[in-house]
Structure formats: structure tokens, C-alpha cells
Amino acid sequence: MGTQKLDYIDAVRGWAILLVITCHVGTMFPEMPYPVRKLTNFGWHGVQLFFLASALTLLMSWHRARVHDGVFVGSFFVRRFLRIAPMYYAGAAIYFVAEPPISGFSLSQMLISFAFLNTWQPEWIPTTPGWMVVPGGWSIGVEFTFYALFPLLAVLVTSLPRALAFFAVAFAFACGANHLGATWLAGYPADAAANFLYFWFPNQVPVFALGFVLYFAIESRRVPTLGKWPAYIFLMCVAAALITVAEFPVMGGRILLSTPTPPILLASLGFMTFIFVLARQPALLLTNPLIRKMGVLSFSAYVLHFLFVHGLPVWSGGWINTAATGYVAIAHFVLLWGVAVPTTFAAATLAHAWIERPGMKLASRLISQATSKAIQRA
């Protein structure tokens, strides 16, 4: 696979983390004008952009390999665990010190989160009052559930028609699971139940399925490379559609089955198109070196950005006023965003070098040793 192809995937991750940071900075200013607040809230769907990129890159790696034996599958799990777990566990330690849980330490909550099982109960995410071991950790739990299923899915879903069938099955499964989940959660507060049904894995499965559709669409030789200006025009249309999804409440709730056109699905379709265009015309301003570097650092940035989004207003001595209202709130939002982004990526640069990269190197060593032993036994 060429470097240029990997460049656009890094860029996608860069845009995803900027969307997520924008959303969480926006939540700090509840009195911003409503249309602006709704637009920043759309950054919530940056997680779905991450999920699409994850499915796409895993499929690229899977199809590059010539053999998919037990050693390969074992190596896949080792690589995924050591890619994510070290920074995730470090984040848990950082937040335990920086934002101590009001409810106190809970060994069971920590172990459930460390096992990436935290998206299977409202108390574990939590959407009820409780200790969130790593802010935003729900998406990492969802990602690990996808990892657990990925080898089986990659074996079964081997073409564009099968990917489309997978999406149809995933959508039906999500709707059915959310219907049953709503009944199961009837005793919980409405907000806790609704948030859980958005976060949990069944509601996100169709997004990963769209990642499979995207992979086979990109690999199809029937679609020509786009020219630069047609690509820009197409992306402007995608941006306009995404802004429409963000601004108009007629689209309804966030949970599949809650409306005929849930925004999670509409946003994912828009992001899918965005990635497809970048794959066909990667030499765009949207894949510039800075955004690609942000993509490389995006996981550490995801784990750490809450620290700065929550902390900077406190540390600023009043310069960043989260109680501001109206247009003044917009100015303070811009100020917080403008400081939180570079400080987050400065910290992420260190975390990537000191925590993520050693984990990846350890994975490579373990995989190399396992492969050598398998060859010797053969």
C-alpha cells in the first residue's frame, strides 16, 4: 500500500479528533447561541468517523496478509491490545489524580473498564452517577468489541454485495437490540437509558458495517480517480449536507429505531462519502501535513483532551469564562478551543513517544517471536 493512501487515513483521523474536541469544548458553554451550540454538538459524531477509519484500516491490513492462520489472528489481538491499552491505562491514572471520582475508588469499575467491557451496563459507562474511569472511554469499549468480532467478520464479508448485506443485517440488529434495550432499561432515568442506548455496541454496529462497504467501494476499479476541483465541489456538498444534519432537529434522536432517519446514520453516510473522495483524490488541502500529524497523535489526543478542556477554564484565572452568554460565549469558546487544541497535541506528542510507541514496539517483538516459533514448528 502506498504512503499516499495511508496519508489520507491519517488525515481522516485528524479531522475526527478535531470534531470531538470541538464538541467537548462546546459543552463547556451552555449559554452559546443555540444554532452555534448545535453545530459544535455535531462534533459528537467524530467518533463515528473514527469507527469508519478503524474498519477501513483493519480491512486493508487483513487483505494485505497472505495467510490468516491462528498465529496471524493472535498477532492481530496482541497488536490491537498493545496499541490501545497502555495509553488507556495511563489515562485512567491521570484522570484519577486530576479529576478524582466523587463516588470514590471502585475496584470493580476499574477492572470492568480495563477489560473494555464498560459499554454493556449503564452503571459501567456510566450514564448513571458514578466513576468514569477514562472520560470518553465508551468509544474505546465499543472499539474493542469490534476488534473481538473483526476476524470473523473479515472472513465472512469478502465483497461489496456481502458488505451491503452486512450493513442491512447490522441495521436490523441495532433496531431490534435498541427496542429490547429500551424495555430492559425501563427502570432507569430516561436520560440514562437514552444515553446508554446510544453508546452501546449494538447501536454502533451499522457504522462499522459502513466501513466494510467503504473498503470494497474504494478497492473497486470501476470508480475513477476524481479531479481536484470536482473533488472540492463534491466535498462542499457533503459539508453542506452534514451541516443540515447538525442544525435541523427534524432529523430526530441519536438512537437507531428512534426515527426513520437517525443522525448517527446520516452523519456516517456523509463521513463515508468524505473518506471515499479523499481516497480517490488524496492530494487535497484536507490531507495536509498538519492534519495528518494530528491523525497520528489522535488516540493520545482523544484520551488527554478532556484534561485541557475541563482544566483550562479553571487554570486561566477568569480569562476563559464558561458562564458567558450569547455572542460573548462564542468568543470564549473560540479562545478555549484555540488553547485546548495545541496544548492537547503537545501533550499527545509526548504520550505518543513515551507510551504509545513503546507499546507498539513491544507488540512487534512479541509477534516476531511468535512467528519465529511457528516457523520452527512447521
Annotated model-derived regions:
Residues 1-183, 292, 297-298, 316-378:
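Membrane-cytosol interface segments of multi-pass membrane proteins
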Residues 20, 199-200, 301:
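A composition/secondary-structure signal for short, hydrophobic, low-basic-content segments
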Residues 25, 64, 220, 304-307:
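N-terminal low-complexity, intrinsically disordered patches enriched in charged
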Residues 57, 114, 213, 270-277:
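Specific aromatic-rich, kink-prone transmembrane helix
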